[in-house]
């Protein structure tokens, strides 16, 4: 039987003596932030892109406006939408 050299447990560990190097710390922080942003993007991508595309606008505030004026405004907005439904743009390519 021949003698077999087995590694000592200390050699299996991670040698991170230089982990206090600012470049290593910065790379670790950037990696963690990137991972967090990627996970958030995958979870909420539809709502995030919708916010960027349409903005946070939900229409003008109606606080302090009488109900009759609110109803009139709603009707004007609906009429404008209905009028747009009748318009079709025809583009002919030559």
From Swiss-Prot:
The modification Phosphoserine is found at residues 61, 90. The M2 protein from most influenza A strains is inhibited by amantadine and rimantadine, resulting in viral uncoating incapacity. Emergence of amantadine-resistant variants is usually rapid. The keyword tRNA processing does not apply. One of its GO terms (cellular component) is host cell plasma membrane. Gene3D superfamilies: 6.10.250.1640. When the channel is activated, one or more imidazole moieties of His-34 probably become bi-protonated. This is Matrix protein 2. The lineage of its organism: Viruses, Riboviria, Orthornavirae, Negarnaviricota, Polyploviricotina. The gene is M.
């Amino acid at each position: 039987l021949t003698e077999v050299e087995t590694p000592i447990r200390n050699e299996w560990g991670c040698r991170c003596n230089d982990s206090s190097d600012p470049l290593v710390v910065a790379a670790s922080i950037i990696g963690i932030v990137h991972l967090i942003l990627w996970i958030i993007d995958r979870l909420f991508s539809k709502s995030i892109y919708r916010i960027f595309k349409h903005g946070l606008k939900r229409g003008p505030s109606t606080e302090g406006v009488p109900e009759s004026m609110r109803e009139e405004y709603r009707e004007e907005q609906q009429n404008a939408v209905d009028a747009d439904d009748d318009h079709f743009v025809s583009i002919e390519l030559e």
